[in-house]
Structures are given as structure tokens and as C-alpha cells.
Amino acid sequence: MNIKLRNINDNKMSDGLQAAIDVINQINNSNDENLTIDFSNIGFVTPLYVLPLVVFINGCDKNIVVTNTNEYLKTIGFTFGVQPDMMRKSEFLAIMEQYSRKTYIPIISFPATKDRDDEKDAILTTVESIIVRQLGISPNVASGLKYMLGECIDNIIQHANSKRGYIFAQSYPDKGYLDICIADNGITLLGSYKTLADNEIEGDLE
């Protein structure tokens, strides 16, 4: 099965998520075990488009081949991302330094198990530093950004039961905002509640 992706509206950030969900549904509903995702029509992508696809592809049991990726997708490390725990710290720092003057960081795939917490902290510090330098963020805003990222990633470590977490960010200076996407392929919020002994929540709507 060949899935040809549609381009998304760069004025509507949420359009990327719906486009990613559409692709995921096509793959899940297909009886084919071998599928191709064709990016030839893609000129613009957002973190909310790219990262859900990365997480899904890396966790999918089917054989998925990605074709016709543009230079931007190659530069951000689609589909496996940069894996800091698989390289020397100096190598990771050198890779990240290459992005210090860009408006984005590569997709970072980091260890998300509790026993790798120290590694996660070192990786997060590097990512935060690059984003702050890229945007020239003031110290008080930087503190808020670091707190937000730390809380989101700690939630993955503590509750998601996921082997890896992912983070990807792109800024849009002309539009005045920063788009950060953090994801995992864990047990979901509902699944986390169901692990509690006194849980009474049975469905997502609750």
C-alpha cells in the first residue's frame, strides 16, 4: 500500500495533527504488512505533524518505508531522530551546536525509563540551552520554558511506561511563536490511571 501525504495549511497548526491521525488510521486499517509513505507532495511540516508519525512508525509492527523526504525532513532526523544515549556526549553537543543559528532543533529521541533519569536531565539541559540561544529568550521566560519542558518530560518518565520519549521544536519568528511537540508511545493517560489501586476511571471521556 502506498500512502501519498497531503500538504498541510501552514496557518493552522492543528491541521498537522489531523493529517498525522489520518495517515495512522490508514495504516491501522490496512491489511497490508508492507506500506510506503510518500512525502513527495509535502512542502511544509509542523512538529505536530511530524512527531506523531515518528512515534507511530517506530512503534508499528508493520514494515513501513518512507520515500521522497525533502531536505528539511532529512535535516531534522526523520524518522529515527537523534539518539543522544547512543553516542558520546561530545558528539551530541557537536550535533546540537549545528542548530544554534537555526529556527528548529532535530527530533530528539531520549531514554524514558526511570533508571536513565540522569541521562534524560543532561539531554534536556542541552535542548533547552539551544532553544533559548536560538530565540534570544530573556531569563524569566527561559525559566518558564525550562520548567514546562521538565514537567512534560518527567510525566513521560514517571507515568507513560514508554522506553523512549521524543521532543521536536520549530520557531516561527515572523508569526511570533514557538511550536514544541513532546511525545511518547506509552500507556496513555487512561492507562496510567488504570495502574492505580483505587482507580475508578474506565474510559477516556471520564
Protein language model regions, located:
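Helix-loop-beta hinge of the Bergerat
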Residues: 103-137, 196-206
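A contiguous, low-structure linker/loop signature
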Residues: 71-118
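A conserved beta-strand-loop-helix scaffold within acyl/acetyltransferase catalytic domains
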Residues: 171-175, 186-187
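Amphipathic alpha-helical interaction surfaces in cytosolic regulatory modules
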Residues: 8-86
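Glycine-rich/acidic phosphate-handling loop/turn and adjacent ATP-lid/helix
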Residues: 180-206
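Conserved ATP-binding N-box helix of the HATPase_c
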Residues: 54-56, 139-173
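A generic structural signal for beta-strand entry/edge sites
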Residues: 34, 175-179
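Signal for well-folded cores of large energy- and translation-related assemblies
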Residues: 132, 153, 157-161, 183, ...
